[in-house]
Amino acid sequence: MKKQEVVEVKLNKTIYGGQALGKLEDGKKIMVWGGLPEELVKVKITKNKRNWAEGIVTEVIEASKERIEPKDQDSYLSTSPWQIMNYDFENNLKRSLIIDQFAQHAIELNLNDFTAPEDPYHYRNKVEFSFWWNNETEQIDLAFFKRGTHTKQPVNETSLALQNINKVATTIRDVLRQKNIQARDLKTLLVRCNQSEEVIAELYVKEQDVDIQISHTEVGAVGFSVHYSNPKSPASIKTKTLFTSGATKLEDKILGNVFTYSVDGFFQVTVPIYEQTLKTIKEHTDPKKPILDLYSGVGSIGLCVTSPNQNLKLIEIDERCVNEATLNAKKIKPEAEIILSSSEDAVDHITNEQTVILDPPRAGLHQKVIDRLLKVKPAKIIYLSCNPATQARDIALLEQIYKISYAHGYNYFPRTPHIENLVILEVVS
C-alpha cells in the first residue's frame, strides 16, 4: 500500500484526537479524517507506517445516520473536522471521550455535568487566515492550510468566526486586491473581535518594503496594522511594525471585570462559555482561603474568581502574559501578586492553606508541581484542562492523597475535537 492510494475501509469508532478508526485488509489500524463510526468509506492514504496508517475520506459509500452536510464544504477539514456530525452526537461523544481518558488510568469518572453552547457556529473571537494566489483571476484569496499538508485551500469566510471577523477579513482582502498586492509578499492576517463587535486586524508581511497603508475605518475595524514578520519563521511574530491605524488593543468584560488584551496575545477565544466555567470555579473556592493560580496566563481565572479581600498569587512563564496580567490586575485587584516564572520553578509558593488553581498547557503538569502538591497537601485543587488525556494522567498520580469531588466537561470549540474538562480535587483526610 502506497501513499495517495485509495482504499475501502469500514470505520468502527471515533478516537481521542478526532479521527475515526478502522482496519485495513492486512489488519493494520488506520486513522481517518472525514469519517464517522459505522461508515463504509473510501480513504486516500496520507501516511503509511509499519503498524498504522492515516488517511482522508474521499467518498462515503455507506453513511452514518449522524452524518450531516458541513457548512464549510471546502475547508471544514482544515478548521473543524467535526462539522460532519450531528451536534448532539458531538457533545455525547466528547462526554464519553473524557470518561474514556480517565478509565485508561483506572479512574471511574462521574462527570457531573457537560456544558456546550446552543449554537455550534460563529463563536470564535480570533481567526488567523493565510493567503493564496488565484492564477485564474490573478488576485489574492484568503486561505487555510489543508489538514496534514503544506498546500492551501482558498476561502471566503469560516463559519466558526464571529460575523464581524469574516466581514473585516474579506474587506481587507478586497482592498489588497485593489492595490494589486501579491500573495508572495503576505504571510497571514490575524483578526480579533470583542463581545462589543469591535474588530482589530493585523497583517503580517514577508518583506519590509511592502507599502500597505490602509485606514482602519476603510475596512470597518477599530484598528489595523501591518507588521514585518521574519519569513524564516512559520509563526506570525512581529519583527517590525510598519504601519498602524487606530487602536492596537481590545477590551472585553469577563464576569463584569474589564480586561485589556493584544490582538496577538493570549485571551479566551470563547468568552461566554468561559464565563460559565469561571462561575463554577468560584462556587468551589473558599473566600477565606488564599488562591494560588498556576499557569495563570493573563490572570483571567484568578482575577475573576477571588473575592475583594481574598489573597491572590499568579504564576506565569510568558512575559507578555505577565505584562497583560499586571495591567489588568491594576483595574481589578491591585494587591494581587504576579510572578514571572515557570510553575515548576515556583513550587515553593504552593502551601497547605491555599486553594490551588491549575490550568496548564496541553502537556499537563510538570512532575515537580505534582510532587509539591503531594508533599504539602493543599485542601483543594481546581484543575481546568484543555487536554483530558494529560489531566487524567496527572490526577492518577494525585489520587494517592486526593479524591475527585466534582467533574464538569465543556465544549469550548464546537465542530472540533478539542475538549475542556474541570475537575475539583479534595485531599483525603
What function would you assign to each model-found segment?
Residues 121-125, 195-198, 417-418:
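A short, glycine/Asx- and small/polar-enriched loop/turn
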Residues 20-25, 142-146, 325:
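Short, acidic/hydrophobic/Gly-rich beta-strand patch recurrent on exposed beta strands
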Residues 58-70, 76-186:
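Extended interfacial segments that mediate partner engagement and assembly in macromolecular machines
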Residues 42-44, 128, 292:
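Hydrophobic beta-strand signal
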Residues 111-113, 184-193, 224, 341:
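A short glycine-rich, hydrophobically flanked beta-strand micro-motif that places a catalytic Asp/Glu
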Residues 2-8, 16-20, 209-429:
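Rossmann-like S-adenosyl-L-methionine
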Residues 196-206, 258-262:
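Short, aliphatic-rich beta-strand segments
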Residues 1-75:
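Terminal RNA-binding accessory module
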